[in-house]
Design a protein with these regions (language model features):
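Active-site-adjacent helical/loop segments in soluble small-molecule enzymes
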Residues: 1, 5, 12, 18-21, ...
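Glycine-rich phosphate/pyrophosphate-binding loop at beta-loop-alpha junctions
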Residues: 4-105, 161-199
Length: 199
């Protein structure tokens, strides 16, 4: 059983899909996927579960929506951010007000990472595990690194966890996919990640 000495960290990309059919707005929120995982883990394990949204630096809609409290009333372009990212499989410029409002009490925070980091992680994961994921699927993979002392979320873990508990933590990452990416395109992703890792 998880408790404050054996915490669970959950990191996942934010996803929102919206379509417009003849002036009829049809919006599908991603509650059935990653959000339900965080929601369920938080209900099951309480304060032992620490949930984070991971987003590209050029498309941090959930972070901006939650930080301002405006949710879907603001978009990344309102803050001069271009919403151009390789993580276009999941990234969008405007957060869902429904998801933001529902998940805010359950989230420990949000973080962003650059596309270059996602490509590097893509190549590293392929080399280490022979697992080929699309760039957007790698957003959450940086969460376990960021929770370590001296990293972005290190102050958070130091504040909320008892001494030594981080060493016992379980890290769960919602890796959204990659098996539908054409082989040639995946090879380009991989080559780019390898090149970036050598810089």
């Amino acid at each position: 059983m998880k408790n404050s000495r054996t915490p669970i960290f959950v990191t996942q990309p934010y996803m929102y899909i919206a379509n417009n059919y003849d002036n009829f707005d049809c919006m599908v929120r991603a509650m059935a996927s990653g959000y339900s995982h965080s929601f369920g883990l938080k209900l099951l394990f309480g304060d032992a579960a620490h949930c984070f949204f991971a987003e590209p630096t050029h498309s941090p809609c959930m972070m901006l929506g939650m930080a301002t409290g405006e949710n879907s009333s603001v978009c990344v372009q309102d803050f001069g951010i271009d919403n151009c990212t390789a993580a276009d499989g999941l990234a969008v410029g405007r957060a869902s007000g429904f998801v933001g409002g529902l998940m805010r009490p359950f989230m420990s925070g949000c973080y962003t990472l650059q596309d270059e980091r996602m490509y590097t992680l893509l190549a590293q994961l392929a080399d280490a595990e022979a697992l080929y994921l699309e760039p957007s699927a790698l957003a959450g993979m940086y969460g376990p690194v960021l929770t370590q002392p001296g990293q972005l979320l290190g102050a958070y873990t130091k504040t909320v966890l008892p001494a030594g508990a981080l060493a016992n933590a379980t890290h769960l990452v919602w890796a959204t996919g990659g098996n539908m990416v054409p082989r040639e395109e995946m090879q380009r992703y991989y080559a780019k990640g390898k090149a970036l890792a050598q810089q």
